[in-house]
């Protein structure tokens, strides 16, 4: 990131609570940044989980003349929103992605579904899973296995995905963890705390 990018990032963080000044700064300074700086500032804010600023820069990037719809751009936004449990923003980004006809590959779908599951957003994860099933891409077993592992805390949802997996890949085996796996870890935690 260049000096201009660093200055812009610092100023954006400083102005984020002052909407009028923030919008003015975005219009006068941020929109003049080089593509690499603008994308770097957005990536840094994603890393820092600065949801509000990420959404602002997301809109700026999409208005740029050089912008082309990109699977990785959307994947990074959705993963950051999942980490921060931002369902409304996720729906907005997903609508934009659909309008721009961006297609995810099966591995990216698997990573996204798992990201939402790991952040305790099973409804959003299953909505993405539905999109994955409707995708024109040929189904692959690895993304299903990634999703099945993330669904261990949600047995009903796991059974549905497991049935789909066995229908698509009839010769494959699905590992089912012991039913008391969650109970065992809770008991171990209690036992450890009792010893202290």
Curated annotation (Swiss-Prot):
Swiss-Prot/TrEMBL PPR repeat ranges: 70-104, 105-139
InterPro entries: Pentatricopeptide_rpt (IPR002885), THA8L-like (IPR044795), TPR-like_helical_dom_sf (IPR011990)
Residue stretches in coiled coil: none
Keyword Repeat: yes
Disulphides: none
Keywords from the UniProt entry: Repeat
Entry keyword annotation includes Secreted: no
Pfam family, one: PPR
Family: Belongs to the PPR family. P subfamily.
Identification of the protein by name: Pentatricopeptide repeat-containing protein At1g62350
Lineage: Eukaryota, Viridiplantae, Streptophyta, Embryophyta, Tracheophyta
């Amino acid at each position: 990131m260049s000096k201009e990018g660093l200055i812009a990032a610092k100023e954006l963080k400083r102005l984020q609570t002052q909407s009028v000044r923030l919008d003015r700064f975005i219009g006068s300074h941020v929109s003049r940044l080089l593509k690499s700086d603008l994308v770097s500032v957005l990536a840094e804010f994603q890393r820092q989980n600065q949801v509000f600023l990420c959404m602002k820069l997301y809109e700026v990037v999409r208005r740029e003349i050089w912008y082309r719809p990109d699977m990785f751009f959307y994947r990074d936004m959705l993963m950051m929103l999942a980490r921060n449990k931002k369902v409304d923003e996720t729906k907005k980004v997903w609508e934009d992605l659909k309008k721009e006809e961006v297609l995810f590959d099966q591995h990216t779908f698997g990573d996204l579904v798992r990201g939402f599951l790991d952040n305790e957003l099973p409804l959003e994860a299953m909505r993405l899973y539905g999109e994955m099933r409707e995708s024109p891409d040929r189904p692959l077993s690895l993304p299903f296995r990634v999703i099945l592992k993330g669904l261990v805390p949600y047995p009903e949802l796991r059974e549905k995905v497991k049935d789909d997996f066995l229908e698509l890949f009839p010769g494959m085996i699905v590992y089912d963890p012991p039913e008391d796996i969650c109970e065992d870890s809770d008991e171990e935690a209690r036992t450890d705390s009792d010893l202290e």
